[in-house]
Amino acid sequence: MSQVAHFTINAEDLPRTRRFYEKVFGWKFQAWGPPGFYMIDPKSAPAAIALRGSLQQRREIVKGTRMTGFECTISVSDIHATEAAVKAQGGTIVMPVCTLAGIGQLLFFQDPDGNIAGAMQYDEAAD
């Protein structure tokens, strides 16, 4: 099966957005290629987890803003610590933590540059 192999975070203010993801998720970035382009150091991210994907009806996570393109959800070990880190680094929680039975706890956030993504603490025992 083919799998997603790369994603890109688009930003106007690269230093601010870079700091946000470094502080919230512990990622490290390295300048690579053309000016204004950075690669996430794969050694700074946790080991890969099994691919989880879905297809769904287009929706609004932020009222009046329909999601476009691919929706990215980042696996985290502590959803509440991630929620606090997002807020501390200038992000906004746009969908509060909710529990998906048998899957885990999910939230959606908006980074300081306006990108919307999810964070999921996987837990098969969630109810």
Roles of regions detected by a PLM:
Residues V4, A50-G53, G69-E71, G104-L106:
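Structural motif
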Residues E83-D127:
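Vicinal oxygen chelate
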Residues S2, T8-A50:
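Core segments of cupin and vicinal oxygen chelate
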Residues D41, P46-R66, S75, P112:
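Conserved, structured core segments of small domains
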Residues M1-Q3, K63-G69, L100-A101:
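Short glycine-enriched loop/turn motifs at secondary-structure junctions
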Residues T65-G90:
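Mid-chain, well-packed structural core segment of small domains
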Residues M1-R19, F70-I74, M120-D127:
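N-terminal beta-strand motif that seeds the catalytic metal site of vicinal oxygen chelate
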